[in-house]
């Protein structure tokens, strides 16, 4: 048996929201292999993967034999090629359950939706082994070793958001739900809307940014936009709509069509409007406005009110894996962002700004 992992994007501390949550596999069936059900064959040849989990993947259409979607009762033959996608499961970390308060927006037997605060790392690793969302979920779900243990009740990440981005995340409670939600993310049918504050006065009331996103070769913790002809990066699309203008900054709603690492941050920076106070992409410096000391102090006060990139995952919608009905969740913009936005609103009302269309 020849097993090949086609890719696994687990580099450094930054992972792709969608692609980093999946592993792609290929199994080449040996010439001497006797006929066997494909689900049994896969469970036998995959480490730490149950037959039940394989059957869930087959049910969701993740498994292909000789490039055709397979059913669980299909018998494989010598020379067959099995290709499949499995939602990624980290291994090798023992999770410490921690009683950390969680803002759970919704919960049932299949999944929960949590409103993550800014500053909380989603998953342990790379210097963050405690105080993460997974540590908190482990305690909440009553699991001794947390979401890395072989426990069917475990919380399973389907996507993630950056440490300093606040907002909604869905966490599956079982394999069937994870695979169903993973498929929806994979097919880009999930509704994800963010609210951001960006530098500059965006010219158009709404627009679409399309550009491949890949790692910056000069900084492994940054990403950049590549032209199609470069053949680098992954296809990414962000739709934006202006919500409020303050001359030197703009409040926008961003809708993700894809979910690449730092996608909104990279795309907005690419068109000359980095997120307010986004240190990694140039938003933690004064990009627009006057040179006067009072203005510089005003900006510093805004940075202190919202000491992170001004980005909140506000809306999350998807088809409920159990009922098949569309379900959507909304969250309030957190206090640090609203305080900063209010300060800008007051500034414009009392001081005004220069016209700064771009």
Predicted regions and their residues:
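Short, glycine- and charge-enriched coil/turn segments that flank and shape catalytic ligand pockets
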Residues: 32-33, 148-151, 230-232, 293-302
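Short glycine/serine/threonine-biased micro-segments
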Residues: 59, 117, 123, 129, ...
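The conserved catalytic core of RNA pseudouridine synthases
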Residues: 151-183, 190-191, 214-273, 304-358
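RNA substrate-recognition surfaces in RNA-acting enzymes
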Residues: 275-318
């Amino acid at each position: 048996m020849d097993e090949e992992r086609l890719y696994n994007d687990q580099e450094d501390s930054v992972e792709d929201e969608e692609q980093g949550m999946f592993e792609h596999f290929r199994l080449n069936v040996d010439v001497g292999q006797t006929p066997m059900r494909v689900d049994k064959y896969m469970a036998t040849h995959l480490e730490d993967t149950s037959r039940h989990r394989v059957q869930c993947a087959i049910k969701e259409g993740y498994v292909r034999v000789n490039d055709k979607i397979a059913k669980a009762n299909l018998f494989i033959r010598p020379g067959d090629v099995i290709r499949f996608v499995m939602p990624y499961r980290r291994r090798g970390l023992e999770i410490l359950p921690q009683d950390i308060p969680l803002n759970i927006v919704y919960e049932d037997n299949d999944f929960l939706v949590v409103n993550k605060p800014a500053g909380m790392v989603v998953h342990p690793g790379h210097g963050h082994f405690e105080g993460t969302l997974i540590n908190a979920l482990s305690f909440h779900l009553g699991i001794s070793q947390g979401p890395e243990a072989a426990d069917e009740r475990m919380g399973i990440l389907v996507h993630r958001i950056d440490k300093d981005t606040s907002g909604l995340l869905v966490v599956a409670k079982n394999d069937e739900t994870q695979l169903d939600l993973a498929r929806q993310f994979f097919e880009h049918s999930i509704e994800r809307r963010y609210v951001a504050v960006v530098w500059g006065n965006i010219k158009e009331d709404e627009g679409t940014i399309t550009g491949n996103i890949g790692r910056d070769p000069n900084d492994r913790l940054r990403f950049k936009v590549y032209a199609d002809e470069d053949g680098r990066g992954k296809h990414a699309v962000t739709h934006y709509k202006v919500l409020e203008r303050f001359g030197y900054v703009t409040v926008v709603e961003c809708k993700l069509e894809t979910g690449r690492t730092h996608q909104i941050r990279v795309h907005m920076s690419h068109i000359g409007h980095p997120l307010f106070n986004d240190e990694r992409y140039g938003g933690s410096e004064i990009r627009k406005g006057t040179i006067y000391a009072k203005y510089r102090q005003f900006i510093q006060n805004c940075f202190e009110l919202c000491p992170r990139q001004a980005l909140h995952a506000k809306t999350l919608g998807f088809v409920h894996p159990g009922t098949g009905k569309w379900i959507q969740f909304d969250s309030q913009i957190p206090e640090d962002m609203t305080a900063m936005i209010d300060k800008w609103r007051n500034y414009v009302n009392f001081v005004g700004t220069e016209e700064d269309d771009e």
